[in-house]
From Swiss-Prot:
This is Hydroxycarboxylic acid receptor 1. Residues 319-334 have a biased composition (Polar residues). It is a multi-pass membrane protein. Keywords: Cell membrane, Disulfide bond, G-protein coupled receptor, Glycoprotein, Membrane, Receptor, Transducer, Transmembrane, Transmembrane helix. The gene is Hcar1.
């Protein structure tokens, strides 16, 4: 990057706001997605196409966790990058790949639910797990091809003793990067809103024929997908559009820089909020989280007698009983069956 084409702003607001926010996202995101991946890998009884898409969404979110400690250090040093050019390229590439991957698989999850609810007999609902996995591989390939340009050139801006590492050049439009940034939002937004409206409308038309609990669960799920998407990605898109509209007068405006950095950090929130999508994806998953919490908090008393344990059978055997209950409910339609034997 031409050092003469960038301006370094050592803004106190950015240095104060960003580190706590990124640390919060890292802790909650790693915890939520780590538990989700554990459930997918070790406690999933049967896999379906929707399960495969959700698993890939969790993988995309977990990959972000690798980058957040380095970005946190960057902001703690008041936007001074000390890890070199190669690390800068890799981190920016992974951040962009996470954003694109999360958007793609959130959209696919919404489309999958749309076909299951609105067109239950469509051939898309009958695709095999192998086809769904191949689709996920194709989508990952497209995501990588769409973001690999960040590896092709340096993004370090050195002025004096300070070096910034940014994917956006704040002094001008960024060509392909801006095109991808806007397209990744508005095209999926259109698809997700279309799916959400049609799912809700279809469920309301059939509410007399469908069980109320299932209708509410499906409605909550699609609304959570739309809400997470808009909350995480709309602010940064609006901030970037404002910058492009006002450039060059806003090129080195500290308030514009602060707004863009803070709203860009909202895109990291998707890794913290996507566990809500997993939670509402299947009636079995909330029970998985509940049993996991109960089993982890249940006190262990090795000195109890056999009689005492017999008296406390409903509590101590909670997890093993849940597997029997889950078997009795296996005929219910769901997006994935979760093995609740987590104790």
């Amino acid at each position: 990057m031409d050092n003469g084409s960038c301006c370094l702003i050592e803004g106190e607001p950015i240095s104060q706001v960003m580190p706590p926010l990124l640390i919060l996202v890292f802790v909650l995101g790693a915890l939520g997605n780590g538990i989700a991946l554990c459930g997918f890998c070790f406690h999933m009884k049967t896999w379906k196409s929707s399960t495969i898409y959700l698993f890939n969404l969790a993988v995309a979110d977990f990959l972000l966790m690798i980058c957040l400690p380095l970005r946190t250090d960057y902001y703690l040093r008041r936007r001074h990058w000390i890890f070199g050019d190669i690390a800068c390229r890799l981190v920016l590439f992974k951040l962009a790949m996470n954003r694109a991957g999360s958007i793609v698989f959130l959209t696919v999850v919404a489309v999958d639910r749309y076909f299951k609810v609105v067109h239950p007999h469509h051939m898309v609902n009958a695709i095999s797990n192998r086809t769904a996995a191949a689709t996920a591989c194709v989508l990952w390939t497209l995501v990588i091809l769409g973001t690999v340009y960040l590896l092709m050139e340096s993004h370090l801006c050195v002025q004096g003793t300070l070096s910034s590492c940014e994917s956006f050049i704040m002094e001008s439009a960024n060509g392909w990067h801006d095109v991808m940034f806007q397209l990744e939002f508005f095209l999926p937004l259109t698809i997700i809103l279309f799916c959400s409206v049609n799912v809700v409308w279809s469920l309301r038309r059939r509410q007399q024929l469908t069980r109320q609990a299932r209708m509410r669960r499906a409605t909550r799920f699609i609304m959570v997908v739309a809400s997470v998407f808009i909350t995480c990605y709309l602010p940064s898109v609006l901030a970037r559009l404002y910058f492009l509209w006002t450039v060059p007068t806003s090129a080195c405006d500290p308030s514009v820089h602060t707004a863009l950095h803070v709203t860009l950090s909202f895109t990291y929130l998707n890794s913290m909020l996507d566990p809500l999508v997993y939670y509402f994806s299947s009636p079995s998953l909330p029970k998985f989280y509940t049993k996991l919490t109960i089993c982890s908090l249940k006190p262990k008393r090795p000195g109890r007698t056999k009689t005492r344990r017999s008296e406390e059978m409903p509590i101590s055997n909670l997890c093993s009983k849940s597997s029997i209950d889950g078997a009795n409910r296996s005929q219910r339609p769901s997006d994935g069956q979760w093995d609740l034997q987590v104790c």
